[in-house]
UniProtKB/Swiss-Prot annotation:
GO annotation (BP), single: ribosome disassembly
Protein name, entry field: Translation initiation factor IF-3
Gene name linked to the record: infC
Complexes and interactors: Monomer.
Gene3D superfamilies: Translation initiation factor 3 (IF-3), C-terminal domain, Translation initiation factor 3 (IF-3), N-terminal domain
Record flagged with keyword Glycoprotein: no
GO-annotated cellular components: cytoplasm
GO molecular function: ribosome binding; translation initiation factor activity
One Pfam family it belongs to: IF3_N
Organism from which the protein derives: Prosthecochloris aestuarii (strain DSM 271 / SK 413)
Residues that span the membrane, as ranges: none
Protein family per UniProt: Belongs to the IF-3 family.
Subcellular location as annotated: Cytoplasm
Role summary: IF-3 binds to the 30S ribosomal subunit and shifts the equilibrium between 70S ribosomes and their 50S and 30S subunits in favor of the free subunits, thus enhancing the availability of 30S subunits on which protein synthesis initiation begins.
Length: 197
């Protein structure tokens, strides 16, 4: 059995600090926003006296730009920001439900309610209308079903383009719309339990 290769990791963003900075002079940006070009050794001593580290933040500038800060705290803040960014950029999953051109009202309501739930959770959805055997001659029923789906899901999503045929299957994708979902959730919260869909 083969082992799966893991995706290459991005190199962690690191800065040169204190003795790692080996250029004759640097531009130091102070906490108040003022700047001054100093000899590297002199800037290092100033940072040491304040109990801080000299951190090179723009190594490509001429001379390189440094700031005085606590390196541990800076690294912690960067790691925290990276984690927050990863949380926010959670990849959306694609959920799919299948219909038939002769799907009855109860099945349509049941399946479209599931699609709506997936969209409210932030997932993309694909509705597939499967034409079995000779039912392909009823393409118009498939397109009617797509229009019903568009109408049913319009309060939480936007269709991605038009419905497309691929063999004996008709596909349409829906993308969640955060603003519409927020409005829908507020309306649901105002409803009495017996009025909720």
């Amino acid at each position: 059995m083969r082992k799966k290769r893991s995706a290459p990791q991005k190199p962690k963003l690191t800065y040169r600090v204190n003795e790692q900075i080996r250029v004759p002079e640097v531009r130091v940006v102070f906490k108040d926003g003022s700047q001054e070009i100093l000899k590297t050794g002199e800037a290092r001593k100033m940072a040491e006296q304040e109990g801080l580290d000299l951190i090179e933040v723009q190594p490509t500038a001429q001379p390189p730009v440094c700031k005085m800060d606590n390196y541990g705290k800076l690294q912690y803040k960067l790691d925290k920001n990276e984690k927050d960014r990863k949380k926010k950029s959670k990849p959306t999953e694609l959920k799919e439900l299948r219909f038939h051109p002769n799907t009855d009202t109860h099945d349509f309501d049941f399946k479209s309610a599931h699609l709506e739930e997936f969209l409210r959770k932030g997932n993309r959805v694909r509705a597939t209308i499967v034409f079995l055997g000779r039912s392909i001659i009823y393409k118009d029923k498939g397109f009617e079903l797509v229009e019903r789906l568009k109408e049913r899901l319009s309060n939480v999503s936007n269709p991605e383009g038009e419905a497309k045929f691929e063999g004996k299957r008709l596909f349409i994708y829906f993308e969640p719309d955060k603003k519409k979902i927020e409005i829908f959730e507020r309306q649901l919260a105002k409803m009495k339990p017996e009025e909720k869909p």
